[in-house]
């Protein structure tokens, strides 16, 4: 079991490093956008409150009459578009690095293409392949997430107007929505990284002449029932791999090596 564990750990280490680097940058993007957007929302909401006559509660209709509200909408759209663009650029770059890194990590000592590598163009094509049953690409999910965030932020603004909440309460509500959106983005990163890890490993094994692979699930307390049932199950190298089996899945695939071969982790 030694080499299987070593193989899985090698892949997991590289994937974990890629995820941490990506998350660090994502947090910066989200923090900057959140600070700018919330400040704009607070100014707009406070302006609405200041325009109300003594004792009169504002309504959504009052909000829509403000030029500041429509300026806010344009600014919000601009900020979220920049956030989405930055995410798309970051993820594209990190996913390509992940694919190349995993592909180049493993090799069989006696394979003819021991030091073969994969180029960026091929890696880019591989990471852009649609693999989920809903037919959506990872890039389209970025924009779905930003659209949801935009709607949620505006819904919370209207909610504050209707319920008469304070500006400080609005800020808390908006921060919560940004946290939800970040968690969706983080889940996307982790799930796609796992898929790319599987893709790259499968292609490397195939190029090395491996005929069969085995699913290897982490054996810690976080291993779920689904992954536990897949552990050590074997699949033909040209088949569809069952992992990642769910969002944030940590399973890997390792080659079924013939007795005369030893696995090399570069």
Q: What are these model-predicted stretches?
A:
Residues 1-175, 260-266:
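N-terminal leader/targeting and assembly helices and adjacent pre-domain segments
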């Amino acid at each position: 079991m030694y080499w299987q564990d070593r193989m899985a750990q090698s892949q997991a280490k590289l994937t974990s490093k890629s995820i941490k680097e990506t998350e660090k940058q994502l947090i910066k993007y989200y923090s900057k956008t959140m600070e700018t957007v919330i400040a704009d929302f607070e100014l707009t909401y406070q302006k609405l409150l200041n325009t109300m006559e003594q004792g009169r509660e504002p309504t959504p209709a009052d909000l829509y009459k403000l030029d500041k509200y429509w300026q806010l909408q344009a600014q919000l759209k601009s900020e979220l578009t920049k956030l989405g663009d930055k995410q798309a650029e970051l993820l594209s770059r990190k996913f390509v690095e992940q694919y190349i890194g995993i592909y180049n990590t493993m090799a069989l000592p006696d394979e003819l293409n021991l030091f073969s590598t994969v180029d960026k163009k091929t890696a880019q094509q591989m990471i852009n392949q649609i693999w989920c049953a809903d037919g959506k690409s990872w890039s389209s999910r970025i924009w779905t997430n930003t659209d949801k965030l935009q709607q949620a932020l505006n819904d919370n603004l209207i909610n504050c107007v209707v319920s008469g909440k304070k500006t400080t309460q609005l800020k808390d509500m908006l921060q919560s929505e940004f946290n939800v959106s970040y968690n969706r983005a983080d889940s996307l990163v982790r799930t796609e990284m796992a898929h790319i890890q599987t893709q790259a490993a499968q292609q490397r094994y195939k190029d090395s002449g491996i005929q069969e692979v085995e699913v290897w699930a982490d054996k810690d307390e976080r291993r779920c029932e689904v992954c536990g049932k897949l552990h050590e199950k074997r699949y033909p190298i040209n088949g569809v791999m069952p992992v990642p089996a769910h969002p944030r899945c940590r399973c890997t695939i390792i080659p079924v090596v013939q007795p005369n071969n030893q696995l090399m982790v570069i």
